[in-house]
UniProtKB/Swiss-Prot annotation:
This is Secreted RxLR effector protein 55. The lineage of its organism: Eukaryota, Sar, Stramenopiles, Oomycota, Peronosporales. Glycans are attached at N74. It comes from Plasmopara viticola. The keyword DNA damage does not apply. The gene is RxLR55. GO terms for cellular component: extracellular region; host cell plasma membrane; membrane.
Length: 125
């Protein structure tokens, strides 16, 4: 009886140590497919906006001889770079706190299962 309790306790401590060990290691988050598609759509929209801005500014440059064509290109490039930097959110990897909740829930679940098993064994005697 004492041997089974010590083996269960050892097993629980081993599981907790492994869970906490993996929680401390830095893990890089991979970008999801949905985020990649959203960024691609934003990029295509920004490219279409800059293209339409270039065509409208070049047509207005043809109408007005005073404006230089290089200024219109620089303006559209500035708009495109501003749009692309504004649409890209800054993502950091997961933090330690993002692992504490699931690790605690797992430990509590294991303890609850162990308590139920111990209770059933005690009731069968």
């Amino acid at each position: 009886m004492a041997a089974s309790r010590s083996s269960i306790t050892t097993l629980l401590l081993l599981i907790v140590a492994v869970a906490l060990g993996y929680g401390i290691l830095p893990i890089s988050a991979k970008t999801s497919v949905a985020r990649q598609l959203r960024e691609q759509v934003d990029f295509v929209d920004a490219a279409a906006l800059s293209e339409s801005a270039t065509s409208s500014s070049s047509s207005s440059a043809l109408d007005h001889k005073s404006s230089a064509p290089g200024e219109a290109t620089n303006a559209s490039e500035t708009e495109h770079s501003a749009a692309s930097t504004a649409s890209e959110p800054k993502h950091e990897g997961p933090t330690m706190m993002s692992f504490v909740g699931p690790a605690a829930a797992g430990v509590l679940a294991i303890l609850l299962i162990g308590a139920v098993i111990a209770f059933k064994k005690r009731m069968n005697k």
